[in-house]
Amino acid sequence: MASVASCDSRPSSDELPGDPSSQEEDEDYDFEDRVSDSGSYSSASSDYDDLEPEWLDSVQKNGELFYLELSEDEEESLLPETPTVNHVRFSENEIIIEDDYKERKKYEPKLKQFTKILRRKRLLPKRCNKKNSNDNGPVSILKHQSNQKTGVIVQQRYKDVNVYVNPKKLTVIKAKEQLKLLEVLVGIIHQTKWSWRRTGKQGDGERLVVHGLLPGGSAMKSGQVLIGDVLVAVNDVDVTTENIERVLSCIPGPMQVKLTFENAYDVKRETSHPRQKKTQSNTSDLVKLLWGEEVEGIQQSGLNTPHIIMYLTLQLDSETSKEEQEILYHYPMSEASQKLKSVRGIFLTLCDMLENVTGTQVTSSSLLLNGKQIHVAYWKESDKLLLIGLPAEEVPLPRLRNMIENVIQTLKFMYGSLDSAFCQIENVPRLDHFFNLFFQRALQPAKLHSSASPSAQQYDASSAVLLDNLPGVRWLTLPLEIKMELDMALSDLEAADFAELSEDYYDMRRLYTILGSSLFYKGYLICSHLPKDDLIDIAVYCRHYCLLPLAAKQRIGQLIIWREVFPQHHLRPLADSSTEVFPEPEGRYFLLVVGLKHYMLCVLLEAGGCASKAIGSPGPDCVYVDQVKTTLHQLDGVDSRIDERLASSPVPCLSCADWFLTGSREKTDSLTTSPILSRLQGTSKVATSPTCRRTLFGDYSLKTRKPSPSCSSGGSDNGCEGGEDDGFSPHTTPDAVRKQRESQGSDGLEESGTLLKVTKKKSTLPNPFHLGNLKKDLPEKELEIYNTVKLTSGPENTLFHYVALETVQGIFITPTLEEVAQLSGSIHPQLIKNFHQCCLSIRAVFQQTLVEEKKKGLNSGDHSDSAKSVSSLNPVKEHGVLFECSPGNWTDQKKAPPVMAYWVVGRLFLHPKPQELYVCFHDSVTEIAIEIAFKLFFGLTL
């Protein structure tokens, strides 16, 4: 299932043995047929007439596409252990022997040929008919209903049965009556005169109900076709009593044919509940995939928790006294949310009254419901009010304010405006799905990563409080050579001047202009050519639909997403009406996301302007989809090098909080056996020397000692030369390594002097992420030491965690999941949780500061004076919290448990560009946050 099929894979004549008639039919297939078959997908080339893309049946009426195939390992893990007749398999042992791979591959070209013949005879259903069909059963069953692919629901509505069909039987038995081919080739008996309950029709014919099985036929041999089943498709081609004979007559020779049946059980149940099954499966497919088999229990527990989303109107019609007329949309339909909905008048009164009294809009309120505190966030636009209510114990108020902003941003990106999203009836199922995911992520964050280890689940849940609401994307720093290779691959794609993407190929204007792209690997952003606003819009969309965690665990075999989007950066009116400012073209914008394994490539396209104008609701063009796939395939060899970067030592170095709870002797020993410092050769010898036996915890002399010269400078003028007396710069190697080098004699001094000469060539601090050619000049031993970078001064590393946000480029850096996994203990996970929650509160203070500074700038008359006022009054904001913690499982009654103190400090930089830094370090550190910030941000570029 994870195999990638492309619509430009035209089989050669060598791949079609024993079929000389194919060349004659090629001549009969004229250009007019090709154009009509291509439809709105604008592929007039015959290369795309051989095989329809596998995602084509999943394109919706409005042109949107959300197609997800799981990886093979993921499908096997989700399938039930005991085989059933309706599990997701495309072949069974009775039909195709699994060990006989070559025999199975022999028939694959004939499947392509079969599709091509059906296309030429115009038996393939038209795309417009597929989109406009209101039938509950989709054409490509397994692709439309992803819950069947995951294997979560055992009893499935549709099943695929592979049977062996031999048209040579027709030479013995001549088909003279209608539907005889169905009996002769397949062994299925259908009585057209029987009175059978019809729940729907496909085409103009009657549904093919299985009334009997021919003894010895292929259907009976399979053991999977039952009386009462309905044959709905042959090789994903809709079949009814009208076209079944023509479809079967197109089979070129002996081959395996896939028959898609609707189960008899569901046919009978459909009459009493025709829509309920379809709605439930569509709205929770992705939820089931993300949260696993426990999704029903999770959703049930979530329904018992008070939470609600309401979109209300403030303009009521006094003439009509319709009940709940002010509610335009609300979710969910649960008893707990019903209580919140019943007090909506309070929210409307607060919104109107406080704005009239204070002149400012209300942002949040809190209320007690059955003894439980509920936070409610407000968002007012014109005469509409959006409310989101969540329990205070699950979602703190600062996070809820950020969450409602993210919801607004995502909905505007998807629909253009809130009214377009909430005021259209056809969007209600999509919004239900949207907020189903939203509340699951808010109330059950740990369950999202059910396949991960408990420590990883805990970190993901605790970090999501802060990281999911930052205006940026998680950035992974890579070596320069890898970065250049990624940039070249994306640049080639964005140029779009080759093959079918070139305007000269068809001698017509191209369909879309590629505005930019961004590449993710295992959930990390590794390369981006998008403006900051577009990057954040796309990242928030992917984050909401949990696409990044899926790619991180390689649960994606193939992912294709296509939809029209409304990036506010391009659509908002210009504040400056000057003619010199570049005006955005009046075009439409589309988002294409293609994922393969760990990779996910997001492409923003523009229709209009330099490209052709989009008419109606265009679906994805297979040429662009294939080019994006090709770009990802070109990066197959890069993933191993990126994995090496993820598996390497943390840069910068981190320490575990539990190491600081022990005594001096135990503390020194724990440092030598830590997974970080153990990579340094000879560390154990240094640790046992008397000069290094010093108590880190409780040694308050560390607080009063002067900082090293290299760390006292806030700029880059003399930051590198300050460590000349120490041999190594303190921020690049531990002091223990420096002492080891000095004890090695003259050879060590000579090597140290050589390194010093190299570093003194530059007058700036060494970049901790891109060491450049300096690494190449070092021997292997020196390279191992040099790669271990720490940001704090002193003999020991006291940095526990950090988050650095670069708002101009829309990225942030923080320790990777692999780096955090190396640090475990009794109090370190709690430290990480406290860090993210504390940073959330600190950032709320920073956001309020930015609002006040912005108001000051607007109130001042001259623009230049406003800039001076901002920079002169509060150029830097800093806020910190001191924590003390001790192990909770302390059993020694004679001794008091050790206590460790650590700081969580946040700093806001307004100039020269907005930046935010949050660090967690031991109380004994002498660094100030601005020094760490300089080292973190130095050289951090896309």
UniProtKB/Swiss-Prot annotation:
Subcellular location: Cytoplasm; Cell surface; Cytoplasm, Cytoskeleton, Cilium basal body; Cytoplasm, Cytoskeleton, Microtubule organizing center, Centrosome, Centriole
Gene3D superfamilies, sorted: 2.30.42.10
Top-level taxon: Eukaryota
Region (Disordered): 1-52, 704-754
Biased composition (Low complexity): 37-46
Stored SUPFAM superfamilies: PDZ domain-like
Key words, A-Z: Cell projection, Ciliopathy, Cilium biogenesis/degradation, Cytoplasm, Cytoskeleton, Developmental protein, Disease variant, Phosphoprotein
GO BP annotation list: cell division; cilium assembly; embryonic digit morphogenesis; establishment of planar polarity; hair follicle morphogenesis; intraciliary transport; keratinocyte differentiation; limb development
One example GO MF annotation: phosphatidylinositol binding
KW Nucleotidyltransferase (keyword) present: no
Main location: cytoplasm
Listed Acidic residues bias regions: 22-31
Disease connection: Short-rib thoracic dysplasia 20 with polydactyly: A form of short-rib thoracic dysplasia, a group of autosomal recessive ciliopathies that are characterized by a constricted thoracic cage, short ribs, shortened tubular bones, and a 'trident' appearance of the acetabular roof. Polydactyly is variably present. Non-skeletal involvement can include cleft lip/palate as well as anomalies of major organs such as the brain, eye, heart, kidneys, liver, pancreas, intestines, and genitalia.
Family to which the UniProt record says this protein belongs: Belongs to the inturned family.
PANTHER family, per the entry: PROTEIN INTURNED
Subunit structure of this chain's protein: Component of the CPLANE (ciliogenesis and planar polarity effectors) complex, composed of INTU, FUZ and WDPCP. Interacts with CPLANE1. Interacts with NPHP4 and DAAM1; INTU is mediating the interaction between NPHP4 and DAAM1.
UniProt name for this protein: Protein inturned
Originating species: Homo sapiens (Human)
Gene from which this protein is expressed: INTU
